[in-house]
Amino acid sequence: MKLSKQDSDLFFDLWFSLLDYTNKKYGIDTSTKIINRKTGVNLTSAFRISDKIWEDTSVIDDYLAENELPEDEQKILKSWHYRIKGTFVIERHLKKGAVIIDNEDNVYIVKGLTQSIRDLTCDFPTPVYIKGTLLPFKNVIITDGLIMPYNVIIGGNMRAELKELYMEAKRNDWIIEKMNIDLLDENRHLLKFFKSDISNLSEKTIDNHMKIVQWYLIYYLANQDLRMQDGLNCLDDFFNREVSGSPNEIKKICTSIKKFYKSMAEHNKISEDDYKSLCSEIKENFPRWAEECNL
C-alpha cells in the first residue's frame, strides 16, 4: 500500500528539489530559504508551491534544463506532466493501495509514499472526498503527498453508486494501476500538432477542442494502452462507455474528434481513407449516440 523506502526516498529527493526550484523561481514563499529532505517545508507553503507546479508544468522542463539528472530521474519528472489534479473519492482501501475515483468515474489504485493512504486518512471513514494530485511514478500511481480530506458525509445512494463504479471497473478490468508514459509522451506530441493546426481559432474554441481531444487520447485511449490509430476502431465504445450529455454536447465532441483526425491525416499519421471512414462512422452513428448519451 506504500512505496518501498528506496522509492519513497527517491520521490522526496526529486519532489523537494522541484519545490525548492519553483519557490525560488517565482518567489512564492520568500521566508523559506531552502527546501530539501533535511529542512522539509511547512504544509501551507507546500500547497502554494505545488499549486504553481501543477497549474503550469512547464516549470518541470525549466528545472530539467538547469539541472543535470540521471535519465531515469528525468523520466520520472517528465512523467509528472500527466498529473491528475482535482477532487476525488477514496472508495475503499485494498492491500495494494487505495481505490480512488475521479470526476470522470475513472477508478485508480493509488499507493502511499512513506505510509499508506489508509493511515494518512485514518480519521475519515470511506468513502471520503479528497482534494489532491495523482502522479505516475515508475510502474505505479502515487500522490504528491498533499491530500486534503473533506469532512462531508456521503449518503447511502452515493455510497452505492461509488461501490458499483468500483465493481464495474473490477469486472471489466478498467482499474488503472499505472500510466503508460511512453504512450502519453506520444500523445503529447500529437496534441502539439493538433493545437498548431487549430491556432487560427479563438482561444476559447481552441481550449474546448484541446480538452475534448486530451480526454479522448489520454483518459480513454492511453488508459487502455491504445494508440491514436487504435481509436479509429473504438469510437462506438468511447461514446457508449465514456460520454453523456445533450445532443449539442455530443455534436461538439464529434466535431473535435473529426478535427483531430483530420490534423493527423494532414501530418500523415493516418491515411486519408482512414479519415474518410471515421467521418462516415460519425455521420452514421451520431443520431444513436445523441439519443443514448442524452442522460
Predicted regions and their residues:
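Short nucleic-acid-contacting surface segments enriched for D/E, G, S/T with interspersed K/R
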Residues: 114-133
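Mixed-charge (acidic/basic) macromolecular-recognition segments
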Residues: 128-131, 135-211
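Non-catalytic DNA-binding core/recognition domains of DNA-processing enzymes
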Residues: 201-266
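Flexible interdomain linker/hinge and immediately adjacent N-terminus
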Residues: 275-295
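OB-fold (S1/OB) nucleic-acid-binding surfaces
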Residues: 91-114
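Structural detector for short beta-strands of small beta-barrel domains
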Residues: 78-96
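Short linear interaction motifs
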Residues: 66-84, 108-114
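A structured, charge-rich N-terminal accessory region that forms the first stable segment of a protein
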Residues: 1-71
